[in-house]
Amino acid sequence: MKREIFPTLLVSVLCLLAACTGTGDRQEPVRNIIFMIGDGMGLPQVTALSLEQGYAPTRMERATYTGIQKTYSAGGRITDSAAAGTALACGEKTTNGTIGMTPDGRPLESVLRRAQRAGKATGIVVTCAVTDAPPDAFVAHNPDRYAQEYTALQYAGSGIDLLVGAGREYFDRRSDGRALTDEMCSRGYAFAPDREALLAARTTPLAALFPGDALPLAARDTAGIRGDYLVRATQKAIELLSGAGHDGFFLMVEGSLIDRAAHENDTEGMLGELRDFDRAVGTAFDFADRHPGTLVLVTGDHETGGLTLIPPHGEETGTATAEYVFSTDCHSATFIPVFAYGTGAEHFTGVMENTAIARKLKALIDVGSRQATDHTHPKATTETNLRERHTQQPFP
């Protein structure tokens, strides 16, 4: 019962907040949402990035509102990316290893799905496989996060406008022999096999799927594959989704490999991924500056590595240097920062459950959709009204 009442109350509260400002004027509705997740990025990682820049402000520090979120999963103090991704994407706790479902197997609606129902263009940009957690939680329902072929099947029928990341093998080198990219192309998708094709794309729907389970770490990319990929891909995604002719857009961008480097206790690799992600955040903030009605939300799914910053061995506190020490090669239960910028950012302050983020985003989508309907003209808001060329397909 509480689960049903809370979203209704939240929408009501946000409707009241959106109805007027101090002057009695209607507040700008949230039209576009850019949700940015640093996988494995906790307060220690954000601190390390600031320290490495000589305490010069990071792009994330441009945020006008900040908060803290708790990451524990259903039945566990330390979450994995599947449970954390489900909380951030859908607004409910679940067990580790579970994607887009409650512990008892009930499918959950994600923020991305809610945005589709509101008539928005939708997209995902990541540096890992698109079928990995947490991005998969925005589209799929899967009791086993490692059943990535099944997740790919759900992506293929999801109606998402833009899908960018690694993991092509789960679409085209499958145990069932199906070529999902061909099936997607038959429904109107363009396919971009590499970065150059992605950046040259002009329309959606688009699937840019790269080989392997992830792109190279930015700091270890001797082949020049990575470069400024995340920044350029974020820019391209915003360009395509904002020009898609929908009632705004929802874009999820993940700096996926902060987590991988931290699992390996690779300080240089971790810092390289943090810098890359921070540059992408700056791109999103810049777009919000130019386009009122845009909310940019930045957070992590959990902290990885149990990172601490301490004086070098034998030195006193107050030294100009610091030593990075990882206490584990796994996740920790550390609280995670939340940075909010743009329209609606004021709703993401204080200490919150990770589930509150998705619930508030859904409520803001609902409020914006109602205001658009009330003050312009009725808009198609069901999944069946998505463009026919890439409508959702049933999956076996």
Question: What label would you give each PLM region?
Answer:
Residues 1-9:
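Bacterial N-terminal signal peptides that target proteins for export
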Residues 8-17:
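Bacterial N-terminal signal peptides
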Residues 21-174, 180-198, 204, 303-386, ...:
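N-terminal catalytic scaffold of extracellular/periplasmic and nuclease hydrolases
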Residues 35, 163, 208-210, 250-254, ...:
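Structural motif
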Residues 43, 275-316:
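Metal-dependent active-site segment of extracytoplasmic phospho-/sulfohydrolases and closely related
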Residues 133-139, 212-222, 237-238, 245-248, ...:
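Active-site His/acidic residue clusters
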Residues 190-194, 225-243:
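A Trp-anchored, charged/polar loop motif used as the substrate-binding/catalytic surface
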Residues 391-393:
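Short, intrinsically disordered C-terminal tails of secreted or membrane-associated proteins
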